[in-house]
Amino acid sequence: MIKSELFERIAEQKINISNKMIERAAKEMLEHMIISLANGKRIEIRGFGSFSLHYRSSRIGRNPKTGKSVKLNEKYVPYFKPGKKLRDRANIHK
């Protein structure tokens, strides 16, 4: 599902909020999440999951095209840990 599909699904719920307002609220929420993560803050949405940054130390990698070794710098990467409710629902249709 892409953002526009998410906005449409929310609008279909007949909650008397315009599509533009739904889109604006969702974009604003995502922007604040990005800013919080960029500032090193953890985000927790109960039942859904949590977002945080994980540290990756520098290491020697390999360019898959050429096979040559390359140095990969240290960095932080976004990490998502699903909450219990999300994990349980994901396994309902097994």
Swiss-Prot record:
Function of the molecule: This protein is one of the two subunits of integration host factor, a specific DNA-binding protein that functions in genetic recombination as well as in transcriptional and translational control.
Protein name in UniProt: Integration host factor subunit beta
Annotated Gene Ontology cellular component terms: chromosome; cytosol
PROSITE patterns, sorted: HISTONE_LIKE
Entry keywords, A to Z: DNA recombination, DNA-binding, Transcription, Transcription regulation, Translation regulation
Cited NCBIfam families: hip, PRK00199.1
Molecular function as annotated in GO: DNA binding; structural constituent of chromatin
SUPFAM superfamilies membership: IHF-like DNA-binding proteins (SSF47729)
Keyword Nucleotide-binding: no
Pfam families cross-referenced by the UniProt entry: Bac_DNA_binding
Family under the similarity heading: Belongs to the bacterial histone-like protein family.
Family matches, as CDD domains: IHF_B
Transmembrane segments: none
GO biological process: DNA recombination; regulation of DNA-templated transcription; regulation of translation
Assembly mode: Heterodimer of an alpha and a beta chain.
